[in-house]
Amino acid sequence: MIKTTLLFFATALCEIIGCFLPWLWLKRNASIWLLLPAGISLALFVWLLTLHPAASGRVYAAYGGVYVCTALMWLRVVDGVKLTLYDWTGALIALCGMLIIVAGWGRT
């Protein structure tokens, strides 16, 4: 389960970076060249999703819980926004959902 969770976090980071770089280009007039690493990051994101041994819908559902947590870490570290009790509570609930789904992978 730890390996799966770490893989999900790596996957989420690739997705967030792949979306953040075009956002910088569009919103902050950054270089159009940011689209190249963004595309690579998104391709890596898709490839990482294929490494899980479950049906794609289950992988996407479980991944969503980790994505929420990773996005909140990004909010804190990159955007510099302090997390609220609601952020922490939502992240905990999302992570619990992911753990429940992953725990059932070998039982179906």
From Swiss-Prot:
GO cellular component, one term: plasma membrane
Transmembrane segments annotated in the record for this chain: 6-26, 31-51, 61-81, 85-105
Record-linked SUPFAM superfamilies: Multidrug resistance efflux transporter EmrE
One Pfam family cited in the UniProt record for this chain: UPF0060
Bilayer topology: Multi-pass membrane protein
The entry's keywords: Cell inner membrane, Cell membrane, Membrane, Transmembrane, Transmembrane helix
Periplasmic side: 1-5, 52-60, 106-108
Compartments where found: Cell inner membrane
InterPro entries: UPF0060 (IPR003844)
Cytoplasmic topological domain residue ranges: 27-30, 82-84
Family that this chain belongs to: Belongs to the UPF0060 family.
Protein name as annotated: UPF0060 membrane protein YnfA
Organism the protein comes from: Escherichia coli (strain K12)
Gene from which the chain derives: ynfA
